[in-house]
Amino acid sequence: MMPPDIKPRSRDVTDGLEKAAARGMLRAVGMNDDDFAKAQIGVASSWNEITPCNLSLDRLAKAVKEGVFSAGGYPLEFGTISVSDGISMGHQGMHFSLVSREVIADSVETVMQAERLDGSVLLAGCDKSLPGMLMAAARLDLASVFLYAGSILPGRTKLSDGTEHEVTLIDAFEAVGACSRGLMPRADVDAIERAICPGEGACGGMYTANTMASAAEALGMSLPGSAAPPATDRRRDGFARRSGQAVIELLRRGITARDILTKEAFENAIAVVMAFGGSTNAILHLLAIAHEADVTLSLEDFSRIGFKVPHIADVKPFGRHVMFDVDHIGGVPVVMKALLDAGLLHGDCLTVTGQTMAENLASIAPPDPDGQVIRTLHNPIHPTGGITILRGSLAPDGAVVKTAGLDSDVFEGTARVFDGERAALDALKDGTIAKGDVVVIRYEGPKGGPGMREMLAITGAIKGAGLGKDVLLLTDGRFSGGTTGFCVGHIAPEAVEAGPIAFLRDGDRVLLDVVGCSLDVLVDPVEFSSRKKDFIPPAPRYTTGVLAKYVKLVSSATVGAVCG
């Protein structure tokens, strides 16, 4: 049997008389005669200077290229965009966050296809760049390895009352809400602002970036143990070099992304997300990656796995610890080994090491859960996973609630309806949102937003105002991985598609039952149905540019808000 061709595509630009011009161009970037026989590896990086999440990627890309060279390949680095959710939060910029996931996937596909690169190492740090890169890997189905930028170290600050606190980005959003209600002096907000980001790296809690990095490791698309070390830790340079070497070995063995991205691999990723109590954005992103890999994945898979996998990680936003602490006690492999030993993971799934997940875990032999940062399965924080899928008269196609950290399973309250986040923020600032209210923010879905904005500004403000346990928030938009409290998102169908959320009115009674996995409006069905007569959705907010294109293509949140 012939060994796999390690240049399955780049021969299109290096071999034969007709490729003289292409070879001439490649000579100008440093290639010589011997290099034309080597596999060409795209090193795709979302490095930029806009946000600390990606600052380490310039350094890590250099180490990846060293690894590719040492393994006998030739690396060619190229860049793609990244949007900072932390900076774009709470204003018009957040409309562009989720669409950046599609732009990243499309741009990586475009370069890889146009230049006929044989494989890729994909580097990302920000929330949407991680799934964007993994979507590209799944779509292209080449030899691919994913590498995370790493998380930021926790900040520390002293407040005006003399107490010292470990703080993350989310504390700033909550401080704004507290200050607006007179519960915190402005000087303390300033102190928190100056401490939350002490250097490079993604937000430190189990927010979206760290959730997706953990999911990537569980999928088998990144090297075992690579998700948890901080961005500044030089172990990351070692993971980067080994990632460059690994992609060449995958080429030699003929292993491509879809060999790794199986249905069972996605079930492993879901289990790890549930055990960590990770971001609800992981549902959108795993659905989208599965779509690109041609794997059938649905909300029912999240429900099924969530019911049997306990929540065992005491991590922010609901817990006490950050990714730095997870790394200190052994990293993501600690959780994976505990789940594997309990029969909750598929150990036979292939990974980018060329070995199975079980073989990887046996090789690195992670310690048992420490009982503090990571609990044992016999003493979980919650007996089921940290995310619950809801259905009901308000969400016939589904909705998502992050149940990790909730003190109650039932909330019944009175609807306060707002068409967009800004109106809700103004009402909170005015003091007109009260205990027992159900704050409904609609026309924020994938099409209606457009872009399915994250509602961190309002959720942080609600918590900062002391209402985090007393107010239920509903939206057809989505939430930051740092969101806490009674928050239901991804409600589908969305308002602009004439979903039931479009017909809620101030004063309607709404019931959330987490145990029953239901979300209902307590209004006579005949009366509620009568409101649908003559429904006319709002005119599109954007008629030109990328968001106008996005609205024409994007699908429901229930299938990952994918575009085609």
Swiss-Prot record:
<feature type="binding site">
    <location>
        <position position="203"/>
    </location>
    <ligand>
        <name>[2Fe-2S] cluster</name>
    </ligand>
</feature>
<dbReference type="Pfam" id="PF24877">
    <property type="entry name" value="ILV_EDD_C"/>
</dbReference>
<dbReference type="InterPro" id="IPR020558">
    <property type="entry name" value="DiOHA_6PGluconate_deHydtase_CS"/>
</dbReference>
<comment type="pathway">
    <text>Amino-acid biosynthesis; L-isoleucine biosynthesis; L-isoleucine from 2-oxobutanoate: step 3/4.</text>
</comment>
<dbReference type="InterPro" id="IPR042096">
    <property type="entry name" value="Dihydro-acid_dehy_C"/>
</dbReference>
<keyword id="KW-0479">Metal-binding</keyword>
<dbReference type="InterPro" id="IPR056740">
    <property type="entry name" value="ILV_EDD_C"/>
</dbReference>
<feature type="modified residue" description="N6-carboxylysine">
    <location>
        <position position="128"/>
    </location>
</feature>
<keyword id="KW-0460">Magnesium</keyword>
<feature type="binding site">
    <location>
        <position position="53"/>
    </location>
    <ligand>
        <name>[2Fe-2S] cluster</name>
    </ligand>
</feature>
<comment type="subunit">
    <text>Homodimer.</text>
</comment>
<keyword id="KW-0411">Iron-sulfur</keyword>
<feature type="active site" description="Proton acceptor">
    <location>
        <position position="480"/>
    </location>
</feature>
<comment type="similarity">
    <text>Belongs to the IlvD/Edd family.</text>
</comment>
<feature type="binding site">
    <location>
        <position position="127"/>
    </location>
    <ligand>
        <name>Mg(2+)</name>
    </ligand>
</feature>
<dbReference type="GO" id="GO:0051537">
    <property type="term" value="F:2 iron, 2 sulfur cluster binding"/>
</dbReference>
<dbReference type="GO" id="GO:0004160">
    <property type="term" value="F:dihydroxy-acid dehydratase activity"/>
</dbReference>
<protein>
    <recommendedName>
        <fullName>Dihydroxy-acid dehydratase</fullName>
        <ecNumber>4.2.1.9</ecNumber>
    </recommendedName>
</protein>
<comment type="pathway">
    <text>Amino-acid biosynthesis; L-valine biosynthesis; L-valine from pyruvate: step 3/4.</text>
</comment>
<feature type="binding site">
    <location>
        <position position="126"/>
    </location>
    <ligand>
        <name>[2Fe-2S] cluster</name>
    </ligand>
</feature>
<dbReference type="InterPro" id="IPR037237">
    <property type="entry name" value="IlvD/EDD_N"/>
</dbReference>
<keyword id="KW-0456">Lyase</keyword>
<feature type="binding site">
    <location>
        <position position="85"/>
    </location>
    <ligand>
        <name>Mg(2+)</name>
    </ligand>
</feature>
<dbReference type="GO" id="GO:0000287">
    <property type="term" value="F:magnesium ion binding"/>
</dbReference>
<dbReference type="Pfam" id="PF00920">
    <property type="entry name" value="ILVD_EDD_N"/>
</dbReference>
<keyword id="KW-0408">Iron</keyword>
<feature type="binding site">
    <location>
        <position position="454"/>
    </location>
    <ligand>
        <name>Mg(2+)</name>
    </ligand>
</feature>
<keyword id="KW-0028">Amino-acid biosynthesis</keyword>
<feature type="binding site" description="via carbamate group">
    <location>
        <position position="128"/>
    </location>
    <ligand>
        <name>Mg(2+)</name>
    </ligand>
</feature>
<dbReference type="InterPro" id="IPR004404">
    <property type="entry name" value="DihydroxyA_deHydtase"/>
</dbReference>
<dbReference type="GO" id="GO:0009099">
    <property type="term" value="P:L-valine biosynthetic process"/>
</dbReference>
<dbReference type="GO" id="GO:0009097">
    <property type="term" value="P:isoleucine biosynthetic process"/>
</dbReference>
<dbReference type="InterPro" id="IPR000581">
    <property type="entry name" value="ILV_EDD_N"/>
</dbReference>
<keyword id="KW-0001">2Fe-2S</keyword>
<comment type="function">
    <text>Functions in the biosynthesis of branched-chain amino acids. Catalyzes the dehydration of (2R,3R)-2,3-dihydroxy-3-methylpentanoate (2,3-dihydroxy-3-methylvalerate) into 2-oxo-3-methylpentanoate (2-oxo-3-methylvalerate) and of (2R)-2,3-dihydroxy-3-methylbutanoate (2,3-dihydroxyisovalerate) into 2-oxo-3-methylbutanoate (2-oxoisovalerate), the penultimate precursor to L-isoleucine and L-valine, respectively.</text>
</comment>
<dbReference type="InterPro" id="IPR050165">
    <property type="entry name" value="DHAD_IlvD/Edd"/>
</dbReference>
<keyword id="KW-0100">Branched-chain amino acid biosynthesis</keyword>
